[in-house]
């Protein structure tokens, strides 16, 4: 299987390293950067949770035309870049499956505007990752990964993608309800990301002290009501799942914390903002989520 990972940030680099470690032919596609230069010259170093390091050697590309020969494109760009990434895929893809492993709501729908909807796969993962220096990504904690078709029934092609991830060490299951999985991942992110970014703490702080526990629980509980109003029946244990993810990735910096600390744009609009927008459609009050969203916007001076 020939795989292109579009967006070699923290998660994209981890995914590329996992797939390349399973002997899949992998290309990291991104803008020219010191990170890609280092990967091209020295390989991609994946630091495992136990401290050991695995070096893999994915190819590197900056020209989007590389996706023309791919069997699978894994989209890991930030959610605010989905539209531009989708347009590039629409011009270059030739029958490849397109898997979104992004944060937030609505990414698959945007991709399906530019590539055939029956080629779009919706994925979620709770694996933690952090790019610590050029050419190096730290696998900050294990998790669950699921994939499923955006439109239509799952088939052998979907199973082959799951097998490639599992072979590389990221155990992946196929689900018939990918949108439910997306919502549950969004709710976990809503419970963890903004709070850790604003308080400048690792994920584990949210389950180690009462204030963190309260914010996580209230935010996720608000989000559950919105998901149900949208017709998505999420697991009753999603609050506990958020706690488990925070505990399992206790030493990890959430992506929003990394972005805010580095002066980069966050994905608050596709996470907290998207939930607030849908809550407004159903006249549901989400004061904690709304406040978290506004505080992140204030911190990044955006809107």
From Swiss-Prot:
- Known pathway: Cofactor biosynthesis; coenzyme A biosynthesis
List, alphabetically, the InterPro entries matched.
6-PGluconate_DH-like_C_sf (IPR008927), 6PGD_dom2 (IPR013328), ApbA (IPR003710), KPA_reductase (IPR013752), KPR-Related (IPR051402), KPR_N (IPR013332), NAD(P)-bd_dom_sf (IPR036291)
Residue numbers binding NADP(+): 7-12, 78, 103, 129, 267
* UniProt-annotated catalytic positions: 185
Q: Report if keyword Ribonucleoprotein is assigned.
A: no
Compartment annotation: Cytoplasm
Binding of substrate, residues: 185, 189, 193, 203, 252-255
**Which catalytic reaction applies to this protein?**
(R)-pantoate + NAD(+) = 2-dehydropantoate + NADH + H(+); (R)-pantoate + NADP(+) = 2-dehydropantoate + NADPH + H(+)
E.C. no = 1.1.1.169
The record's keywords, sorted A to Z, are: Coenzyme A biosynthesis, Cytoplasm, NAD, NADP, Oxidoreductase
Tell me a GO biological process for this protein: coenzyme A biosynthetic process
Q: Which GO terms describe its molecular function?
A: 2-dehydropantoate 2-reductase activity
What the record says about family reads: Belongs to the ketopantoate reductase family.
Provide the protein name. Answer: 2-dehydropantoate 2-reductase
């Amino acid at each position: 299987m020939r795989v292109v990972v579009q967006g070699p940030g923290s998660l994209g680099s981890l995914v590329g390293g996992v797939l390349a470690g399973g002997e899949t032919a992998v290309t990291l596609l991104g803008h020219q950067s010191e990170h890609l230069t280092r990967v091209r010259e020295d390989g991609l170093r994946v630091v495992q949770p136990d401290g050991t390091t695995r070096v893999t050697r994915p190819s590197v590309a900056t020209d989007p035309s590389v996706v023309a020969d791919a069997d699978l494109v894994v989209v890991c760009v930030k959610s605010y870049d989905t539209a531009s990434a989708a347009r590039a895929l629409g011009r270059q893809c030739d029958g490849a499956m397109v898997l979104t492993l992004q944060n937030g709501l609505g990414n698959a729908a945007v991709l399906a505007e530019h590539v055939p909807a029956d080629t779009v796969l919706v994925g979620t993962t709770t694996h933690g990752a952090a790019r610590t220096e050029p050419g190096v990504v730290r696998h900050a904690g294990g998790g669950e990964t699921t994939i499923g078709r955006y439109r239509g029934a799952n088939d052998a092609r979907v199973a082959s993608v799951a097998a490639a991830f599992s072979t590389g060490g990221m155990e992946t299951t196929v689900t018939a309800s990918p949108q439910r999985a997306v919502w549950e991942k969004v709710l976990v992110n809503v419970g963890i990301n903004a709070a850790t970014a604003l308080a400048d703490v690792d994920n584990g702080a949210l389950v180690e002290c009462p204030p963190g526990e309260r914010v996580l629980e209230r935010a996720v509980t608000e989000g559950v009501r919105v998901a149900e109003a949208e017709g998505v029946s999420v697991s009753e244990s999603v609050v506990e799942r958020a706690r488990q993810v925070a505990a399992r990735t206790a030493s990890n910096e959430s992506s929003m914390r990394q972005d805010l600390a580095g002066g980069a744009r966050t994905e608050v609009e596709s996470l907290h903002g998207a939930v607030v927008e849908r809550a407004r459609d159903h006249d549901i009050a989400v004061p904690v989520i709304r406040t978290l969203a506004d505080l992140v916007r204030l911190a990044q001076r955006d809107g």
